[in-house]
Amino acid sequence: MSATPLFKTYDPVEKLISQVGALASGGTGGGTTTNALATTGGTMTGNITMSGTSKITQATAPTVASDVTNKQYVDSAVSAVSAPQMSFAGWKLNNASFFEVNPTTQVKLFTNIDGIGANQWTDTTEDAISVSGGIFSIQNKSTSKTMWYICSAHFTGLSNKTAPTVAGALRFKFNDEDSGNPINSQWCVLRSFSTSNVPSPEASAPQVSGSNMMYATISVPPGTTRRISVIANNPSATDVMQLNQTDDVCQIMITRQS
């Protein structure tokens, strides 16, 4: 009995589909090899070379150390760890005549000043800090984030003009110019020494006095400007108090927190 012949049906369409599928998956088909990446999963060997303006796009941030990332993620990571340029502005009472505060009066202190440093701070993207007439304007240019600022003021060089042999005092607060309310809850007090208690030759120097510092931390919402001042109050009913306007006395500094 002879063997029954075996016949196999050849389907050209099926063959074509199998070859195209292999090519799309980065395999071989009918003697043709391609290095195209698999559309789902798979592994590719060799280098990827992009020509012209072509690029590989990755929309999501990496999750493990071996993941590919994108420019947006790198930029945000670098900006988070880099030391940003901080906004800083400072002023001092300039070398003019004595700043006088009459009895039982309250005035703005820094109306006649010189800047500390080369320039007042202005940043086209973050903020701007300026002063006019003793009022300090802090502008937050961000449209999305609240900025916080540390304001510090240093006081010294106080003397009693009316009665040099009598100790005197001035009181200071940061004031919110927009609401009219003080920012500090308590007064910062600067006292002078009685010249009768100061040994010679210091007795002839009008800047002999105590010193004190005052601080305030303020917030400026996005797209707004906060206006502040330093007010000086003379509690005496009879004596005129004066501040010596030399380079080393009465300074104010405003710094943005990082």
Swiss-Prot record:
Organism for this UniProt entry: Invertebrate iridescent virus 3
Protein name: Uncharacterized protein 036R
Family: Belongs to the IIV-6 219L family.
